[in-house]
Regions:
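Acidic-basic catalytic patches of nuclease active cores, encompassing PD-(D/E)XK
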Residues: 1-28, 83, 92-96, 104-105
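Conserved catalytic cores of phosphodiester-cleaving nucleases, focusing on short active-site segments
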Residues: 29-45, 49, 56, 63-64
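Long, low-complexity, charged/polar intrinsically disordered regions in eukaryotic proteins
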Residues: 85-164
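Positively charged, polyanion-binding regions of nucleic-acid-associated proteins
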Residues: 158-192
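Short acidic, hydrophobic short linear motifs in intrinsically disordered regions
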Residues: 178, 192-206
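Short amphipathic alpha-helical interaction segments
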Residues: 208-221
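A short, conserved structural fragment
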Residues: 221-231
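Short, cationic-aromatic polyanion-contact patches
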Residues: 231-256
Length: 256
């Protein structure tokens, strides 16, 4: 069943009402935007639409919208009256970095010259009703709907430059901690020096657990942001494409 969240995003990105739920060849498309691009909104994993998008890209420009829920408020309803009996804010927080989890199963498609990946952050209300637990690990509730409160901080990814830019813009990103930089003399490190890292260093740059950094490292490698340059113990070493390192160096200097 389609959620209010999905309906709202289709209307948000469509050129007008007539461009929602459009038939293109053998596919039903969520929307067509004002530039004529086919829009696919995918709240679930991107792997589910991988084959569809690959086929559409043969003849069309495609805009994939992958929303990330930054903040969620949970409203629990009474089963009989369907009135709200409890409200709380979910402790879980997400940001743009979480798109890497979906890209794990989308690297066969992205990047592509006719593909735009758009990642808006959402604040939403999720409406639930209690459910009897039928299995040991089954959820104790059923989600009735998800409604958008606000859409903000829309990031657009069109090529590998955009992926690396997101990494390098993290507050905890410090190129001096790369393996290549750490071997230079103190105070002599330059951003032009190739950035070599393992997933432990990447986890520090992202301020995330190492298991998450491993997912990011895989995506960066598969998309062509990095290449494997050896191992340190059991850890793979990755080097950032020199063109991207230079790009970061120029933008960093301009900001200064």
């Amino acid at each position: 069943m389609e959620t209010s969240l999905h309906r709202t995003l289709k209307a948000h990105y469509a050129a007008d009402e007539s461009q929602i739920e459009v038939r293109v060849s053998s596919f039903r498309i969520d929307a067509i935007d004002d530039l004529g691009r086919l829009v696919e909104v995918q709240h679930a994993g991107l792997g589910a639409i991988r084959s569809k998008v690959m086929k559409l890209l043969e003849n069309h420009s495609v805009r994939v919208v992958k929303p990330i829920v930054a903040n969620k408020w949970i409203h629990t309803l009474d089963v009989k009256s369907l009135k709200v009996v409890r409200k709380r804010r979910s402790p879980k927080r997400s940001n743009h970095l979480d798109v890497f989890a979906s890209l794990l199963h989308f690297t066969q498609v992205f990047p592509h010259q006719k593909l735009t990946l758009e990642v808006p952050l959402l604040d939403i209300v999720e409406t639930r009703v209690p459910e009897k637990k039928r299995r040991v690990r089954a959820k104790q509730y059923r989600v009735l709907d998800q409604t958008i409160i606000s859409i903000h901080d829309d990031l657009i990814f069109q090529d590998i430059d955009d992926l690396w830019r997101m990494i390098s813009m993290q507050p905890t990103f410090d190129p001096r901690s790369s393996l290549q930089q750490s071997t230079t003399k103190r105070g002599k490190a330059k951003l032009e020096t190739p950035l070599v890292f393992d997933t432990s260093i990447l986890a520090q740059w992202l301020d995330r657990p190492r298991w998450f950094a491993q997912q990011v490292a895989y995506v960066l490698f598969r998309c062509g942001v990095t290449s494997e340059v050896g191992k340190l113990g059991n850890s793979k070493l990755y080097q950032v494409d020199k063109r991207l390192t230079a790009l970061h160096s120029r933008s960093d200097g301009a900001a200064a």
